[in-house]
Swiss-Prot record:
CDD domains: Ribosomal_L22 (cd00336). This is Large ribosomal subunit protein uL22. GO terms for cellular component: cytosolic large ribosomal subunit. This protein binds specifically to 23S rRNA; its binding is stimulated by other ribosomal proteins, e.g. L4, L17, and L20. It is important during the early stages of 50S assembly. It makes multiple contacts with different domains of the 23S rRNA in the assembled 50S subunit and ribosome. One of its GO terms (biological process) is translation. The keyword rRNA-binding applies. Part of the 50S ribosomal subunit. Keywords: Ribonucleoprotein, Ribosomal protein, RNA-binding, rRNA-binding. It comes from Paracoccus denitrificans (strain Pd 1222). It comes from the Bacteria. The gene is rplV. Belongs to the universal ribosomal protein uL22 family. GO terms for molecular function: rRNA binding; structural constituent of ribosome. InterPro entries: Ribosomal_uL22, Ribosomal_uL22_bac/chlpt-type, Ribosomal_uL22_bac/org-type, Ribosomal_uL22_sf. Pfam families: Ribosomal_L22.
């Protein structure tokens, strides 16, 4: 008579990972997310490894977490995984300031964002 198990939030052949508080704007993060959408996970990992974008390393960690979740928690085959979805959301915006001329104050916005990566197992095509 234990605790009831929560229902799955994704389909049987899917797994996901979410990373919050990434110190970049959602617009810049979405450029990296668009780079991996729809690709096989090994190709997406290679693209992130050699990307010149600063945030690509954090996206790579999130993708590796999604792959590990698929393998360990959902018993999916890693060789047949694709990046089904990768979406980006806004998080908080830290507000900072800089003194300006004539006693004024310039606002500096430091945005944070979050990314969710969903991987799906596809059937092997013969």
């Amino acid at each position: 008579m234990g605790k009831e198990q929560n229902p799955r939030r994704v389909a049987e052949n899917e797994a996901f990972a979410k990373t919050k508080m990434l110190r970049t704007s959602p617009q810049k993060l979405n450029l990296v997310a668009a780079m991996i959408r729809g690709k096989k996970v090994d190709k997406a990992l290679a693209d992130l490894t050699f990307s010149s974008k600063r945030i690509a390393g954090d996206v790579k960690k999130c993708l590796q977490s999604a792959i590990a979740n698929a393998e360990n928690n959902h018993n999916l085959d890693v060789d047949n995984l694709i990046v089904a979805e990768a979406w980006v959301g806004k998080n908080l915006v830290m507000k900072r300031g800089r003194p300006r001329a004539r006693g004024r104050y310039g606002k500096i916005m430091k945005p944070f964002s979050e990314i969710t990566i969903k991987v799906r197992q596809v059937e092997e095509r013969a």
